[in-house]
Amino acid sequence: MENTLVKSLYRDTDKYAGQTVQVSGWIRNLRDSKAFGFIELNDGSFFKSVQIVFDTELDNFKEIAKLPLSSSVKVEGKVIVTPGAKQPFEIKAEKIDIEGLSDSDYPLQKKRHTFEYLRTIAHLRPRTNAFSATFRVRSIAAFAIHQFFQERGFVHVHTPIITGSDTEGAGEMFRVTTQDLNNVPKGEDGQVDESKDFFGKETNLTVSGQLNAEAYALAFRDVYTFGPTFRAENSNTTRHAAEFWMVEPEIAFAELGDVMNLTEDMLKYAMKYVLEHAPEEMEFFNSFVDKTVLERMNNVINSDFGRITYTEAIKVLQESGADFKYPVEWGIDLQTEHERYLSEEIFKRPVFVTDYPKDIKAFYMRLNDDGKTVAATDLLVPGIGELIGGSQREERMDVLVDRIKELGMNEEDYWWYLELRKYGGTKHAGFGLGFERFLMYITGMANIRDVIPFPRTPGSSEF
C-alpha cells in the first residue's frame, strides 16, 4: 500500500474518511490499557500528529503497547472522522509494523525541556514542537524570499564563500589556510609568507556576498544572493552567531528610495506567505512563545513604513524627554533602545532611518552632497529595532577610491570592484537582511541559536 502523508489527511480529511490508509512516522506519545491504546504519531510532514487507536485485535498488541518514545512504525488502518474530539479524525489500526526501536534512554521524554538544554542535543531538537515549528517556518520563509525575487525577474547569484576582500572593512574574519600551523612559512621580515598558502594570498570566509552581487547587477540589472556568511566576532549574545545567512539583493539604475520600496515589498510578501502556508506553526508561536507575534506581523503587513533622516531622528530622540541608557548625539550610531523608541513610540510601525554620518557606515555607501552623510538606510521595526540595512552604492570611481584610502584599506584588494565603475558603471543600490534575525522576529524566538539548525558561536562548533 502506498504511504499517505499526515499533512494530506489533515488538509483533505473528507476525501480519506472511511478509507484504509498507510502512514509511517515516529511515536511522540503512547498511552495504553489492558485492551487498547493510543499513539500520537508524527511523520514530519505536518506540525500536528495523528492519533492511532490500537487494540488487542493486533497480533503484536503487547509489543506495540511497550514501544519507547521515538520508535518508528508503519501503520495501516481506517480513517475515522471524530468531529467532537480534539482532533478531526483518528486512525483505527489494523496492522502496525515496527520499523526502528528507540532506546529507553531517549532524552526527549514527556516533560518540558528548556531551550538551553535542547541546544545540547541539537541533533534531536527538531523532534520537539517548538523546533519542528521553527525549522518548518525557516524553510517556508526561505522559499517565500526566493519566490518573491524570482517572480520579479531577479537572477539568483551564488557568491563565493572564500574571499580575498572584506566587504565591511571590519576585519573580524575567519582565515582560510592549508598551512601547517606548527611550521608556518615566513618571509625575511618575519611575517607569514602568504604566497606559500593555497591561494597565494590571504583569504577568509566571506562576511557578505554584496560586492560580488554588485558585479552581477551591472550585467543582469536585478540580482540577489541568499547564502551563509561568517563573522569572527567574539560576541556571546542572543543576537550574534559566527555563521548565519544573509539575503542580499542588488538593483541597477536605482537609488536609495528604490531599495527602500523593495525592502518593504519583500518583507510584507514573506510575512504574508508564512502566515498563509504555516498557520499551525504561527498559532503555536503566538500561543506558547510570544503572544504578540501575529499582531506584530499584521502590523508590518498593514503599515506604510515611515521614513525619517538620521539627523531628524537624533533631534526627535533628544527632544523626547525619554531616559535613555546611551547618549543620543549626532555622529554616534543609534543603539537598540533608540531604534525601538523610534519604531514603537514615535512611529508605532516600521520606519526607515536614512542618511547616516559617513563615519559610522561602510566604505561603499554613496556620499551625499553635504559631504558628511551617506545614502544609507536602516529599517527599524517594533519589538526588535534594526532588521535590515541598505544603501545606494558609490558609483563614482574617484569618490570611492578616496573613501578606501581614507579608511586605510588596501586599494589593490578591491581592483576588480573599482573596475566595475570604469566600464559603464551606473547608480545601483541594495540591502542586506540577516535571515535569522528575520526568523526571530516572526517566530518570537529570543535567541539566534534557536533559529539555526546547528548554531556556530564562540567556543561552540558541535554537531
Swiss-Prot record:
A Gene Ontology annotation in the biological process aspect, one of them, is: asparaginyl-tRNA aminoacylation
SUPFAM superfamilies, per database record: Class II aaRS and biotin synthetases (SSF55681), Nucleic acid-binding proteins (SSF50249)
Subcellular location, record wording: Cytoplasm
Per its UniProt record, what CDD domains does this chain match?
A: AsxRS_core (cd00776), EcAsnRS_like_N (cd04318)
Keyword set includes Zinc: no
Catalytic activity of the protein: tRNA(Asn) + L-asparagine + ATP = L-asparaginyl-tRNA(Asn) + AMP + diphosphate + H(+)
Gene Ontology MF: a single term: ATP binding
Kindly state one GO CC term assigned in the UniProt record. Answer: cytoplasm
* Keyword entries, A-Z: Aminoacyl-tRNA synthetase, ATP-binding, Cytoplasm, Ligase, Nucleotide-binding, Protein biosynthesis
Pfam families found in the cross-reference section:
tRNA-synt_2, tRNA_anti-codon
- EC number(s) stated in the UniProt entry for this protein: 6.1.1.22
Would you identify the family this protein belongs to, as annotated?
Belongs to the class-II aminoacyl-tRNA synthetase family.
Q: Subunit info?
A: Homodimer.
Query: What name does this protein carry?
Result: Asparagine--tRNA ligase
Q: What organism does the UniProt record list as the source?
A: Bacillus cereus (strain ATCC 10987 / NRS 248)
